[in-house]
UniProtKB/Swiss-Prot annotation:
This is Spindle assembly checkpoint component MAD1. Residues 46-99, 136-533 form a coiled coil. Central component of the spindle assembly checkpoint. Its main location: nucleus.
Length: 657
């Protein structure tokens, strides 16, 4: 069933036959494959090295982290043991210092002993527990240290292996460069040989052309000499004409100036005659006009100066008005602030008075309680000898209550005085400010005018500098050399991969910082439980999920594209088979192929490629079906010939019908 004929076609593109051009062609064919293989090996080794390096760095970081955590736990356990020892010593010292003075204290002492024994037992249990924990932690630390040493040794081995492989790769690159240079030299020699063969024929043609060119050259030289002579004559004539044209232009300009001067003289004469008629005097001349003009110009300058002074005074008064308005607003704000402060102080005073009343009531209650306490003290004196301490405590308490009442009175007095002083100071400030405002404003106006002039000068200087720099910039832009631009794909896979790695690195750093802070919080708050996950770990997982979704989408697009290409090519293949062989193929499940004839589409053949069986409904149409099947398929094993004979018979039947 294989279509091995020379006239058959396939749906896939066949590779063209390579014409052997000797040793040179074979070298050209083999070297790119070797280069690609070596590059592929080099990339694989680099990737393996980076993966192993990252893995070992991660393991080292995890081991160091766990070692630090264990070390912290050890220190905490030791600190707790020290605290328990100190508390035990403190309790023992208290027990030794306290002696029983009556039967009740003896009972309490016995209770304390019982409690102390229970605490000692608890302490012993805790000590044993912490010792066992310390032993386990030491063992785990030693195991981690051994793992660290083994990991470092393995890392060194991997680094040595990678260095050796990198040296081998460098040597391979050198050999590749040498081979490429040899290939370039061979190509240059081949091109030179081909070029030399064509040069001999070109030299012959050029000798013939040179002879014809020499004859033409002589004729051209004679013509050139005559042309140069006439050119010189023409230039001399043109120079004379240009001189005449310049003189003619000067003459026209002089005539125009004379006409303008005449018109000006006529205007002056008219003006002088009009002036003489107005003044009724024959002595009026141009000198009189100049004197009048200068006097009017002086008057105009005086008026402009007066106007400038008026403008300046108006501007100064406007500035004064604005500043006074600002001062007024500030004073109003200060007034509001002081009023708010007074209200707040009154509230404070009211609260303090309430506190004073409460304290006085407390003092009265305490004074009422003093006689009852004195009776109690007398009873205690009969039983205990330490009555002097209680008396001193009562005296101190009385003194403190008296001091508190005195402080409350003093605070109220000071608040009242502050309110009064603030009111008087506000009035004094307003009076002082009102007297000195005009002087301060005049001084400030002069200073501001001087500053304004200096700033305007600086502004002009800077503007000139900016104009110069802008001119230089324009010159530089005009004379800017063309830069060499390196083309790069906008959406290249390398840029995408770098962007993804950079984003993953940033997310991992943030996650690492958050986890470290979380570990510190857990170590500080040992009793609290932390059931939350940091947001950065969720963000990193989300980013990885988005990347995986993007890759899935790309793979799905690629798969759908390949599926479309496959369907298109398979349809082309079926159409080609139908047009060339006269059969339409339909591939079914379980390795079955259904074959329809183009001459009788309702009849078919089913070939099972797994069981090597053949079924058909053509036996009702073709009379000698069994004989053809036995002859071609069973005896000779030629299924293509059997199908060809079927097509011939079906074609005859179609023509006969």
């Amino acid at each position: 069933m294989n279509n091995s004929g020379s006239g058959g076609s396939s749906p896939f593109v066949e590779s063209p036959d390579l014409v052997s051009d000797g040793h040179l062609h074979t070298e050209r064919k083999d070297t790119p494959i070797d280069v690609d293989n070596w590059k592929y090996k080099y990339d694989n080794l680099l990737n393996q090295y980076e993966i192993e390096k990252v893995r070992w760095q991660k393991e080292q970081y995890d081991s160091e982290k766990s070692h630090e955590a264990l070390h912290l736990q050890l220190e905490k356990a030791r600190n707790e043991i020290d605290q328990l020892v100190e508390s035990k010593r403190f309790l023992e010292a208290q027990l030794q210092s306290q002696h029983p003075q009556n039967t009740q204290k003896e009972w309490s002492h016995e209770d304390n002993k019982v409690n102390n024994n229970s605490m000692n037992n608890d302490y012993m249990l805790l000590e044993e527990k912490y010792k066992s924990d310390v032993f386990h932690l030491d063992n785990s630390v030693n195991e981690l240290k051994l793992e660290l040493t083994s990991c470092r040794s393995l890392l060194k081995k991997y680094e040595e292996v990678i260095e050796q492989q990198s040296e081998q790769i460098k040597e391979i690159k050198k050999t590749l460069k040498k081979k490429e240079q040899e290939l370039d030299e061979i190509e240059v020699n081949r091109l030179k040989q081909a070029h030399n063969a064509t040069n001999t024929e070109e030299i012959r043609q050029q000798t013939n052309e040179n002879a014809s060119f020499s004859n033409g050259y002589n004729t051209l030289m004679s013509m050139k000499n005559s042309v140069n002579y006439w050119k010189n004559e023409n230039q001399q004539l043109n120079q004379k004409l240009s001189e005449y044209s310049d003189i003619y232009q000067q003459l026209q300009e002089a005539q125009l100036e004379i006409m303008e001067l005449k018109a000006n003289l006529e205007e002056w004469n008219k003006f002088l005659s009009n002036k003489k008629q107005q003044d009724n005097s024959n002595d009026y001349s141009i000198d009189h006009f100049i004197i009048e003009f200068e006097s009017q110009r002086r008057e105009l300058n005086m008026v402009t100066e007066e106007l400038a002074e008026v403008k300046k005074s108006y501007y100064n008064s406007k500035i004064l008005n604005d500043e006074l308005a600002l001062e007024r607003n500030q004073l109003l704000k200060l007034k509001d602030d002081y009023e708010n402060n007074i209200i707040n102080l009154e509230k404070l005073n009211h609260e303090l008075e309430q506190q004073k009343v409460l304290l006085e009531e407390e003092c009265s209650l305490l004074k009422n309680q003093i006689p009852t306490k004195e009776n109690l003290n007398q009873q205690i004196r009969s039983t205990n000898r330490n009555d002097a301490e209680y008396d001193s405590l009562l005296d101190n308490y009385k003194q403190e209550t008296e001091n508190l009442t005195n402080e409350l009175k003093r605070l109220n007095d000071s608040l009242i005085e502050q309110n009064r002083n603030q009111g008087t100071e506000m009035k004094k400030r307003k009076l002082r400010n009102g007297d000195h405002i005009n002087i301060n404003y005049s001084q400030r106006l002069n200073e501001l005018q001087q500053n304004n002039l200096s700033l305007e000068k600086d502004n002009e200087k800077l503007r000139l500098v900016v104009e110069k720099l802008e001119g230089k910039l324009d010159d530089l832009r005009k004379t800017k050399p063309k830069n060499i631009r390196i083309l790069q794909q906008r959406d290249s896979p390398l840029l995408k991969l770098q962007f993804v790695r950079r984003k993953e690195n940033e997310l991992l750093r943030e996650e690492n910082q958050n986890l470290l802070t979380m570990i510190e919080n857990i170590t500080e708050n040992r009793n609290e439980s932390f059931d939350k996950i940091p947001l950065t770990s969720y963000n990193s997982l989300k980013y990885q999920y988005e990347i995986s979704m993007d890759t899935n989408k790309k793979q799905e697009k690629k798969f759908s594209r390949l599926k479309q290409i496959f369907n298109k090519k398979s349809l082309e293949f079926i159409d080609v088979v139908n047009s060339l062989l006269g059969f339409k193929l339909e591939f079914q499940q379980d390795g079955r192929v259904k074959i329809y004839s183009c001459y009788m589409p309702n009849k078919y053949l089913i070939a099972n490629l797994v069981d090597n069986t053949l079924k058909s409904n053509l036996d009702t149409v073709i009379s000698d079906w069994d004989s053809l099947l036995n002859d071609w398929v069973v005896e000779k094993g030629q299924l293509p010939c059997f199908l060809a004979s079927l097509t011939l018979q079906l074609w005859k039947m179609e023509n006969d019908s």
